[in-house]
Curated annotation (Swiss-Prot):
The keyword Transport does not apply. This is WD repeat-containing protein 82. It comes from Danio rerio. PROSITE patterns: WD_REPEATS_1, WD_REPEATS_2, WD_REPEATS_REGION. Regulatory component of the SET1/COMPASS complex implicated in the tethering of this complex to transcriptional start sites of active genes. Facilitates histone H3 'Lys-4' methylation (H3K4me) via recruitment of the SETD1A or SETD1B to the 'Ser-5' phosphorylated C-terminal domain (CTD) of RNA polymerase II large subunit (POLR2A). Component of the PNUTS-PP1 protein phosphatase complex, a protein phosphatase 1 (PP1) complex that promotes RNA polymerase II transcription pause-release, allowing transcription elongation. Component of the SET1/COMPASS complex. Component of the PNUTS-PP1 phosphatase complex.
């Protein structure tokens, strides 16, 4: 089944899970699409089975809190950042609920975490105005970059380069093998005083970069030239909430939730609005991602919703 405008418009909430007492701050699908794992401000980690459509287990990180949860390539392991006490990144085995390793270094809250798509490398960005490069096999930071402001960062789909959005006004591209030489490209965007950048993602085909903000606009950039191809607005975000925006796996569409529980979908190439879906969420849709392998997506406020198409194209 191929994603088309009409298939996207047909999506409806198939299941709602009420496992959390506070907002879900992040979730991540496994690369095979079979599970999704969430982190929440209630200090819990919930693992869901996407095929059976049910929660499998819940773990807790009471002392440090849990945010920015990401699967690693090893089965049943995740990395996540803390949202209280310290700013150490933790590497957890879900299998026995034990920490494998800690990654100390940041001295302010970690606001970005991206796992390499190809190996054990990951990068983190923090309010301490640094980006750090790590390897899961070592607690020591493998590289450090000092920046002029708050960073958001992400690997490209090949894992060869990473992009850093700095101070909500420029995107810098770094070669992973020689990042200490500085960026090989810098794209300066018009500075918007009304909002901050909160996320940065590449499309799976590597051609586009999506910049999300805590305001009412999203931007799509050409990943090679840095030109702004589209600015998307028209969704509600009056309170400056961090709303996750995502590409569909085929790189053709861009989705974002809103503070009123609705999901907005645009065509990434034409910039036309394709769908407006009502998730009936009780709060802002803080997290939204399409499953990498199956025709389903998930959205979350303090509840988690699984969506399915209602037509067979």
């Amino acid at each position: 089944m191929k994603l088309t405008d009409s298939v996207l418009r047909s999506f409806r909430v198939a299941k709602v899970f009420r496992e959390n007492s506070d907002k879900i701050n992040c979730f991540d699908f496994s690369s095979n699409g079979e599970t999704v794992i969430s982190s929440s401000d209630d200090d819990s980690i919930v693992l869901y089975d996407c095929q059976e459509g049910k929660p499998k287990r819940t773990l807790y990180s009471k002392k440090y809190g849990v945010d920015l949860i990401r699967y690693t390539h090893a089965a049943n392991t995740v990395v996540y950042s803390s949202n209280k006490i310290d700013d150490t990144i933790r590497y957890l085995s879900l299998h026995d609920n034990k920490y494998i390793r800690y990654f100390p270094g940041h001295n302010k809250r970690v606001v970005a975490l991206s796992m390499s798509p190809v190996d054990d490398t990951f990068i983190s960005g923090s309010l301490d105005k640094t980006i750090r490069l790590w390897d899961l096999r070592s607690p020591n930071c493998q590289g450090l970059m000092h920046l002029q402001g708050k960073p958001v960062c992400s690997f490209d789909p090949e894992g060869l380069i990473f992009a850093a959005g700095v101070n909500s006004e420029m995107v810098k591209l770094y070669d992973l093998r020689s990042f200490d030489k500085g960026p090989f490209a810098t794209f300066k965007l018009q500075y918007e005083r009304t909002c901050e950048w909160t996320g940065l993602k590449f499309s799976n085909d590597g051609k586009l970069i999506l910049v999300s903000t805590n305001g009412g606009t999203l931007r799509v950039l050409d990943a090679f030239k840095g030109a702004v191809l589209h600015s998307f607005g028209g969704y509600n975000n009056s309170k400056g909430v961090i709303l996750e925006a995502s590409f569909t796996p085929d790189s053709q569409f861009i989705m974002i939730g809103s503070e009123d529980g609705k999901i907005h979908v645009w065509n990434a190439e034409s910039g036309m609005k394709v769908a407006l879906l009502d998730g009936k969420h009780t709060g802002p849709v803080t997290c939204l991602q399409f499953n990498p392998k199956f025709m389903t997506f998930a959205s979350a406020c303090s509840n988690m919703a699984f969506w399915l198409p209602t037509i067979d194209d």
